[in-house]
Swiss-Prot record:
Protein family: Belongs to the antibiotic N-acetyltransferase family.
Enzyme Commission code: 2.3.1.81
NCBIfam families assigned to the protein according to its UniProt record, in alphabetical order: AAC_3, AAC_3_II
Function: Resistance to antibiotics containing the 2-deoxy-streptamine ring including gentamicin, kanamycin, tobramycin, neomycin and apramycin.
Any one Pfam family match given in the protein's UniProt record, by short name: Antibiotic_NAT
Protein name per Swiss-Prot or TrEMBL: Aminoglycoside N(3)-acetyltransferase III
GO molecular function: aminoglycoside 3-N-acetyltransferase activity
Gene that produces this protein: aacC3
Organism: Salmonella sp
Keywords linked to the UniProt accession: Acyltransferase, Antibiotic resistance, Plasmid, Transferase
GO biological process: response to antibiotic
InterPro entries reported for this sequence: Amioglycoside_AcTrfase, Antibiotic_NAT-like
Enzyme class: transferase
Length: 286
C-alpha cells in the first residue's frame, strides 16, 4: 500500500520542485493501491510543489455533447432542451482523462475554466491566472490555459499515463505553421449570467488528428509521435511512482520541439515530402 509520503518523495525524485507549475496526467490504476485513494495522490502532488506551486489537470466534462454535435451533427429538439448547461462549479469531469481530475476539482481552492469540452482545473497560487479566460474557439491553442501553462514555465507530469497524453503538445499543433490543418465544429450549451441556456457553436483545430495522416484509427496521432521522438533525445526525466512508469517534461522545451518537428516534416516546404509522410502514416523519417 503506497503512502502519501512515499508518493511525494517519488514525485520529487523525478525532478518536481517546490514552486513548480505542474500539469498532471495520471492513471490511478497504474500507480496501484494508495492509502487514502485518489485524495492522497492529490495531496502528494500538492506537497511536492509546496504552497507556492500549482497543480493543473485536464478535466473536460462528462456531459460534453462534442461527439453528438460534431461537424454539423445535431441533437433532436428534446435533447437540446434537456441537456444540462456547462457550469464549472458543478460539472463532472471526463473519466477518459483520468479519475484524478475529479479529485482536483473537489480540492479546496480549485478553479475551473469555462470551456466545456477543454475545461482545465488548477489548484494553487496560479489557478486563476491559468483558468481565466477560456472561451469557445480557444480550446488548447492561443488564449487557452494550456498556452498560459507553457508560457509560465510549467512541467508536464505523466503518472502512469501514456505518451499520447501530453496535452501541451496540442498547443504545439495549434501554433505550428503547417498547411492543411484539420478543423472541427461543435456546439456546447452555455449558461448565461441570468441562468438562461444558449447553444453556441465553436470552431477549433482537430485535436484528434491535426493532419489527415494523424487521424487514422489505430495509428499514432501527432502528440504520441512527437512525444516518442522527444523522449529519444533524453531531455526529460523518467522514474517510478508507486508502480507507475512516469515521465516529466519541461513544457516549453517539448512544445518548441513539437512545433519544429511539425514544421520540419509537414510545413509548406517540408524536408519530408507530404505524400511520403502520408504513406508512412506520419512516422518520422529519422
Amino acid at each position: 500500500m503506497h503512502t502519501r509520503k512515499a508518493i511525494t518523495e517519488a514525485i520529487r525524485k523525478l525532478g518536481v520542485q517546490t514552486g513548480d507549475l505542474l500539469m498532471v496526467h495520471a492513471s490511478l490504476k497504474a500507480i496501484g493501491p494508495v492509502e487514502g485513494g485518489a485524495e492522497t495522490v492529490v495531496a502528494a502532488l500538492r506537497s511536492a510543489v509546496g504552497p507556492t506551486g500549482t497543480v493543473m489537470g485536464y478535466a473536460s466534462w462528462d456531459r460534453s455533447p462534442y461527439e453528438e454535435t460534431l461537424n454539423g451533427a445535431r441533437l433532436d429538439d428534446k435533447a437540446r432542451r434537456t441537456w444540462p448547461p456547462f457550469d464549472p462549479a458543478t460539472a463532472g469531469t471526463y473519466r477518459g482523462f483520468g479519475l484524478l481530475n475529479q479529485f482536483l476539482v473537489q480540492a479546496p481552492g480549485a478553479r475551473r475554466s469555462a470551456h466545456p469540452d477543454a475545461s482545465m482545473v488548477a489548484v494553487g497560487p496560479l489557478a486563476e491566472t491559468l483558468t481565466e479566460p477560456h472561451e469557445l474557439g480557444h480550446a488548447l491553442g492561443e488564449g487557452s490555459p494550456v498556452e498560459r501553462f507553457v508560457r509560465l514555465g510549467g512541467k508536464a507530469l505523466l503518472l502512469g499515463a501514456p505518451l499520447n497524453s501530453v496535452t501541451a503538445l496540442h498547443y504545439a499543433e495549434a501554433v505550428a505553421d503547417i498547411p492543411n490543418k484539420r478543423w472541427v465544429t461543435y456546439e456546447m450549451p452555455m449558461l448565461g449570467r441570468n441562468g438562461e441556456v444558449a447553444w453556441k457553436t465553436a470552431s477549433e483545430y482537430d485535436s484528434n488528428g491535426i493532419l489527415d495522416c494523424f487521424a487514422i484509427e489505430g495509428k499514432p496521432d501527432a502528440v504520441e509521435t512527437i512525444a516518442n521522438a522527444y523522449v529519444k533525445l533524453g531531455r526529460h526525466r523518467e522514474g517510478v511512482v508507486g508502480f507507475a512508469q512516469c515521465y516529466l517534461f519541461d513544457a516549453q522545451d517539448i512544445v518548441t520541439f513539437g512545433v519544429t518537428y511539425l514544421e520540419k516534416h509537414f510545413g509548406a516546404t517540408p524536408i519530408v515530402p507530404a505524400h511520403e509522410a502520408a504513406q508512412r502514416s506520419c512516422e518520422p523519417s529519422g
